[in-house]
Regions:
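Acidic/histidine-rich catalytic cores and adjacent linkers
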Residues: 43, 48, 54, 167-169, ...
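Acidic, glycine-enriched active-site microenvironments
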Residues: 101-110, 187-190, 338, 345-346, ...
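Short, conserved DNA-binding cores of transcription-related domains
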Residues: 1-90
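The DNA-recognition helices of helix-turn-helix-type DNA-binding domains
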Residues: 131, 142-146, 219, 234, ...
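RNase H-like nuclease fold core
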Residues: 134, 138-216, 221-226
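Short alpha-helix plus adjacent loop in nuclease-associated cores
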Residues: 243-264
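Short, positively charged, Gly/Tyr-enriched micro-motifs
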Residues: 50-53, 60-169, 209-210
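Short secondary-structure boundary/capping segments
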Residues: 174-175, 229-234, 251-256
């Protein structure tokens, strides 16, 4: 089967014909050059108004990069016509295989964008013999198209969280859909202020916001304020992973301070290399760590008492009754306040202040898993590590939408993989 026959089967453009096909270059750097010409008496499409117009003259040959075949670079060669449009004046025609002045064919751009989900942008460019900039433009095109064509209807549950993308407290606010039938990134905004989250609800619209049933977030005050105002009808659930993170942070502070004090007082370094013993869940400890932890808990140390308070708090999630869960929180907070361990007392005060929101976990009755938000954040961090960081928030947004947004793509007859 001739290559021209294959192209006419999968890449047939109305008003254009494939002419000469040449294999050029050195054996180590072969290229297929495919000459395209307009059909006789055909008219071009005006880039301004999309009307069919007569040709005015032609420009020099442009090269458009197409999907490589058998490891050989493929280029479309075409002389764009300048059109004499009654409405727009003289303009260069819009060709159907590329957008604007881009030298990548649309088919190749979609091809690169799909592979950029599996590989880093740098590796994608290297694998297909193109530039990082071409991969970036392809992903940007795919994200723009996907955001314009996605549906936001039927969203009942959302999760709000933030990630640090640069040093110096540079944050991005991320909003996810966490419904059982659909989990995806919905929106990204700069910083983590009230205005940031207002931006999401303004985009989402009042009607859709009023249909939300569950909202999951951490205890960041700006988020709490906006959610209470814009989605007051929804059950607002505090992310249990962030609550446990506050407990772990307090334990780490207690351990570090106590270890320094013991060293200054000349005691045995009992707390050396014990950080992960106290922070890990018991089921994740190695056999060696389990033995060391059993030895450590025999000592009446503040670090040990903090650890035991944290492990006792985990019993909260086993309750099925909102009433008895509230009683448990009250007793735990009272006991923690009497422990005279300042970092743990600080956490107890925070939990008391957010008790009602915490109890919404039980009102949801297992309908929502906040672990989905944490899972998405881990994927977002993995995306950033794979890219070795981002120079601008816009690059980060494009990459995260592309990876986590579950954005639609145009239907094609072939995908080349």
């Amino acid at each position: 089967m001739l290559l021209k026959t294959i192209l006419n089967s999968i890449e047939k453009y109305k008003g254009f014909v494939y002419k000469d096909i040449k294999l050029t270059g050195e054996p180590s750097n072969l290229m297929l050059e495919i000459l395209i010409e307009p059909r006789r008496n055909s008219r071009g499409v005006c880039r301004g108004c999309s009307d069919l117009c007569s040709g005015y003259d032609t420009q020099s040959i442009r090269r458009y990069e197409y999907i490589p075949l058998w490891g050989i670079a493929v280029f479309f060669l075409y002389r764009p016509r300048r059109l004499n449009c009654p409405e727009c004046g003289i303009h260069v025609e819009q060709v159907p295989w590329a957008v604007g002045k881009h030298r990548l064919t649309q088919r190749y751009a979609w091809f690169l964008s799909r592979w950029a989900k599996r590989l880093s942008w740098k590796e994608t460019a290297k694998a297909f013999g193109t530039s990082w900039h071409h991969v970036y433009r392809s992903v940007e095109m795919a994200v723009d198209w996907g955001l314009k064509h996605r549906s936001l209807e039927g969203v009942k549950s959302i999760g709000v969280d933030e990630i640090a993308w640069r040093k110096g407290h540079k944050y991005q606010t991320l909003v996810y859909q966490i419904d059982t039938h659909c989990k995806r990134l919905l929106w990204i905004g700069d910083e983590r202020t009230e205005d940031t989250l207002y931006g999401f609800f303004n985009m989402f619209g009042k009607k859709r916001s009023a249909q939300l049933e569950y909202v999951c977030s951490d205890m960041w005050k700006a988020y709490l304020n906006v959610i209470a105002e814009r989605a007051s009808q929804a059950i607002h659930i505090l992310d249990r992973f962030h609550i446990v993170a506050h407990l772990n942070k307090a334990i780490d502070q207690v351990r570090a301070a106590e270890a320094r004090q013991m060293k200054e007082d000349g005691y045995d370094p009992l707390l050396t290399n014990t950080r992960w013993l106290l922070l890990k869940n018991p089921e994740n400890l190695t056999e060696k760590q389990e033995i060391k932890l059993k030895e450590l808990v025999q000592y009446n140390l503040k670090s040990v008492r903090s650890y035991l308070l944290k492990e006792d708090f985990q019993r909260l999630w086993q309750y099925s009754s909102k009433y008895w869960a509230g009683k448990f929180i009250d007793k735990w907070c009272t006991r923690t306040m009497r422990s005279k361990i300042d970092p743990m007392k600080k956490v107890a005060k925070m939990i008391r202040g957010h008790k009602e929101l915490m109890l919404n976990w039980f009102e949801a009755n297992g309908q929502l898993s906040s672990g989905v938000v944490e899972g998405f954040n881990n994927k977002a961090k993995l995306t950033m590590r794979k890219a070795y960081g981002y120079k601008s928030p816009n690059l980060l947004k494009i990459s995260l939408y592309h990876t986590l947004g579950d954005l639609p793509m145009p239907k094609t007859t072939h995908r080349f993989f």
